[in-house]
């Protein structure tokens, strides 16, 4: 076990040294050069581990295959993690700090003023005695999703080194998951699986197979500028129109006031001037019928606004779907959930089924017909300078991946 932990830790520390922060404004993938550098590094490691069909596409998608070594394990399972880190926080020059046998209380991050406190993060009380990996307070850590990469790679290493019986295994590492481009160039024809798992969750025990239905709405207001001293009956202020329009949304139907399986509208961007304004809304709901109602609500609100204002330039609205709830696909492959549950229980873990209040690469794969639930990594506080992961949680993820691959003993 200690040998596995040392390997796991070293892999993780190696991977977070790559600056793979994705760029929100990018129209191509990979959106950052560091992702391709990490992809090529992983390609070499996979070859050294003895995997077959190891490929890296021009879009930095890494795929590899490990054939079954047991005649009774003929099915194929995929494991997926993403290369990039969030654009919300710097991922350059990450300096991890390893805290062995955490004794509780505040954790100072580096030499600055940043710290992590159980007052703000009560889950820290559950981590006393664990080995924590934290940041120096200037960057994110990159456990999302390099912990997942390290866990998959370590599991492959253990399977090979100890000759543990396993099914056919497909592995993929994808770019730009954080900006929604992760599956855009995914070579699905080169990744034939009965089902797959993303290793991209949070605390130990998380098993996620429901996510938001998601769409974005772009609403455009056109105004007419003129000198404000002579503006009576002439000026049309697009900024004022946009503010008034936004007041038509339900006040409590927002991210900061919803949880669980509750959906929301989220004003994500407001940009422009007197002559033109664009509002960007995120539309989210788990229930397909309610999701359709939310999109209809916005169209109706625009129609009503245009009717009441009699504008020369009517408000324009374009709504585009982003991804769907993966449960519509996963429910048809119940063994994907049953196997993950059994593997966790065999590792002494109580499965925690919870909805994803977001999306994953698995949601996009589900649209293509591949069931792909999400499994924990052992990390917390993703996308922030307070991000951390426990070495013990990562080791549990390795054990679960191995158990899933070696499902004949479950």
Go through each PLM region and give its residues.
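Short, conserved micro-motifs enriched in small and acidic residues
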Residues: 33, 139-150, 232-240, 388-395
């Amino acid at each position: 076990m200690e040998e596995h932990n040392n390997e796991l830790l070293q892999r993780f520390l190696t991977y977070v040294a790559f600056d793979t922060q994705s760029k929100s404004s990018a129209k191509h993938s990979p959106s950052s050069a560091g992702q391709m550098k990490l992809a090529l590094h992983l390609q070499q490691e996979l070859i050294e581990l003895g995997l077959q069909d190891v490929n890296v596409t021009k879009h930095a998608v890494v795929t590899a295959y490990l054939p079954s070594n047991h005649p009774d394990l003929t099915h194929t399972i995929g494991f997926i993690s993403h290369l990039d880190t969030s654009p919300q926080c710097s991922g350059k020059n990450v300096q991890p700090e390893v805290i062995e046998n955490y004794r509780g209380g505040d954790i100072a991050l580096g030499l600055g003023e940043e710290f992590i406190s159980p007052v703000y993060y009560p889950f820290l009380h559950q981590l006393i005695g664990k080995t924590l990996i934290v940041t120096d307070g200037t960057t994110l850590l990159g456990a999302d999703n390099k912990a997942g990469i390290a866990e998959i790679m370590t599991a492959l290493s253990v399977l090979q080194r100890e000759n543990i019986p396993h099914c056919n295994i497909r592995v993929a590492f994808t770019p730009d998951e954080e900006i929604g481009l992760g599956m855009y160039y995914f070579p699905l024809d080169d990744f034939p699986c009965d089902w797959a798992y993303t290793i991209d969750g949070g605390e130990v025990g998380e098993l996620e197979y429901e996510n938001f239905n998601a769409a974005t709405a772009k609403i455009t207001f056109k105004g007419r500028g003129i000198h404000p001293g002579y503006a009576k009956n002439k000026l049309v202020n697009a900024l004022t129109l946009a503010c008034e329009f936004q007041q038509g949304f339900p006040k409590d139907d927002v991210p900061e006031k919803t949880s669980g399986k509750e959906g929301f509208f989220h004003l994500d961007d407001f940009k422009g001037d007197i002559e033109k304004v664009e509002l960007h809304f995120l539309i989210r709901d788990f229930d397909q019928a309610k999701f359709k109602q939310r999109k209809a609500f916005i169209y109706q609100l625009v129609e009503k606004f245009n009717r009441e204002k009699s504008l020369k330039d009517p408000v324009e609205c374009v709504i585009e779907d982003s991804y769907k709830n993966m449960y519509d696909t996963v429910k048809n492959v119940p063994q994907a959930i049953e196997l993950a549950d059994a593997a966790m229980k065999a590792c002494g873990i109580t499965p925690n089924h919870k909805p994803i209040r977001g999306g994953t690469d698995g949601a996009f794969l589900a649209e293509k017909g591949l069931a792909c639930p999400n499994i924990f990594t052992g990390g917390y506080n993703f996308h922030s300078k307070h991000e951390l992961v426990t070495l013990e949680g990562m080791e549990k993820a390795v054990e679960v991946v191995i158990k899933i691959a070696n499902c004949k003993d479950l």
